[in-house]
Amino acid sequence: EIDQYLWNTGHQYGEWLIPSQTVDGADQSAAKPVNTSAYCAPIFGWNSCRIMADTAALLGHTSDELYYDDIASRMKSAIQKGLIDDDGKMPLDFMGSYVLAIAFDLAPERKKESIAGHLIRKIEENGDCLDTGFLTTRICWMRSVRSAGWTRHIKSCSRQSARHGFMR
């Protein structure tokens, strides 16, 4: 039941241009056997189904709304059970995975604090610099604007330096 609703098979681009995964501006993550598609594809797949359900509701297409809402609910459950471990860790210990789980409110209530803790740990380990790719950097900014609780994140976004890859 879980694997069926984790859209993580076949070719997936995942997140790319993560500074720590680049070498002189060339993205190296595609060469890795396990890349960010382990979390990007399932989470953005869930988001697409959620958007479809919301759109169907706006258009008054009740049967389509129920259909996509059911898929989105099953996908959210699969993400919570199959991607987020008991300690709130994601399949790849990348900042972007935690950003998406927080921003899309996919974490079960009992794991929200530990997921936020993993994100803060990753930021601290990286010298208070962000290490997110093009998919999650925008989400980081949008989330920090809406949440006064992301003061560490705001500090990392305002840094004038970068530590890895093409941003050296």
Predicted regions span which residues?
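Active-site core of glycosidic bond-cleaving carbohydrate-active enzymes
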Residues: 1-168
